[in-house]
Amino acid sequence: MRLDRSGINPTPLMLGNDVLGDCTSAGIGNHIRATAALAGFQVAMDVADAVRFYSRSTGYVPGRPATDNGGVEVDVLTTALRDGYALETQTLFPIWGSADPTDLNGIRNITAGLSAAYLGVQLAQADMWEDQDGNLPPVWDTDSPADHGDPTPGSAGGHCLLLWDYTGTADTDLVTLLTWGAKQKATWRWVRSRIMEAHGLAWGQLHAPGGLYPTGDDWAALVAANDAYLAGAA
């Protein structure tokens, strides 16, 4: 089983994640863009949009580095559900739910049905190795060369990224991740070793009719579940 989206460009953006720990906000922004790309259009956004939401969802204060501490994914997603992800001309509201991060089949279903899976991973120092041109390893894998640094998950901290497609389901089959404004290849065994949380997002304002996207009673049930979650979190 594979999910081939090589003919569709989700055009991920950096959205400030090269200078700030706003990967949770950038992940939501790029999820919007991935969803739009699958529907045949695109949604414009910029660094200011991502930083504004990062501030709203985490308490980051621009110009005060001590407040740049990243975000907790469920808290950030709850902020998006409650307040929306504000862009210059519109505010987009997701509904969302969490999945068992050890259930890779479930994550594949999220990726296929909801445009991309929103993941939290523990990066290793070996994942952050760069060649002489400043490029990351072409494929993230668990058998990185010894000179690439510590391969221990978490030795480079946590990160939020999106899973976009995959060539198969075997351990060494490749997935495409959307992170830092680019497509990054990894193996499924890398995903298994690094993943710590997984979430699905759906955008009622963006999706095109048809396909695997929830509609009708399924959509109503998701909305009701999110409303109940917000009521409990209030």
What are these regions (language model features)?
Residues 1-234:
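Catalytic-core signature of thiol
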